[in-house]
Amino acid sequence: MALPLSDPNAPEFTRRYVNLADPRLGAQALEASDDFFAPKERMLNPEPAVFIPGKYDDHGKWMDGWETRRKRTTGYDWCVVKLARPGVIKGVDIDTSHFTGNFPPAASIEAAHVPDGAPNEATKWVEIVPATTLQGNSHHYVEARDANAYTHLRVNLYPDGGIARLRVYGQPQLDWAGASRSALFDLAAMENGGYVVAANNQHFGLASNVLLPGRGVNMGDGWETRRRREPGNDWAIVALAQPGVIRKVEIDTAHFKGNYPDRCSIQAAYVQGGTDSSLVTQAMFWPVLLGEQKLQMDKQHAFEAELAALGPVTHVRLNIIPDGGVSRLRVWGTLDK
């Protein structure tokens, strides 16, 4: 099944930053004032929301999101979300897909920094998204302008209703300054701040999946391109979380058996200046970090001695030759001094 097209109107922060509310990275919906019609956890599902006509449960129409009962008192509904990592929030997407007569007229988002435990009555909340008018069956992209790092959010619905998905895009905050300069870090890991700048094709699976933690759960939990019918090869460019010297690379083709790439190679560079989009052309000429290597189906491949000594780099380009699917990419390196 081909992937649905991404929203062409989505702002840059949805592509540039990590979804800190992704449960695959560790985010959790902790508590809610009410989730009678649809559980709060469903709001964080990384898959796009769906609508299933005729599907009902004991509480009524099944909806793919978080939905509260009709409020017959004063006040408003809320849900507390623990982010996957502490981070500086750059923007959110409050998605009401398929909620038409049951979406909230407005919503706001507050944030708190609670490094130990969960928020309580003494927690100080800071509004990062003011009360925003919502429409049914729509994405609502709101930029956040707070430079502080937060660990938890409180989503407020005025007064009640349902939202399909909550995406919270931000920069994970790690103590890189205090980190060891001799330890190995997965500099491409999404939870560390690595992200996919661009990929030439993502027909069957998003390139960003290769940066997720753990091994892929199935073939859909990886990056897969369409069958190439012309010369050339497919590729994805990854911005590393921090500049570093690459010591080891792992390429995992888990679950890809009749559709894994025949070969792969990696280029890398230390990029200063320019924009993400300007890297696409430049990356063709980057130095080779890993020359062409044969791949096997459903296997973790590790490369160390094969890596060229390029010094510190900020970006890598994974080439899969000619096409196919990769489950995970790990780029282990030491931090640039």
Swiss-Prot record:
It holds the Pfam family Allantoicase. The keyword Signal does not apply. It comes from the Bacteria. This is Probable allantoicase 1. The lineage of its organism: Bacteria, Pseudomonadati, Pseudomonadota, Betaproteobacteria, Burkholderiales. Disulfide bonds: none annotated. GO terms for biological process: allantoin catabolic process; purine nucleobase metabolic process. Signal peptide: none annotated. It comes from Burkholderia mallei (strain ATCC 23344). The gene is alc1. It catalyses: allantoate + H2O = (S)-ureidoglycolate + urea. GO terms for molecular function: allantoicase activity. SUPFAM superfamilies: Galactose-binding domain-like. Pathway: Nitrogen metabolism; (S)-allantoin degradation; (S)-ureidoglycolate from allantoate (aminidohydrolase route): step 1/1. The keyword Metal-binding does not apply.
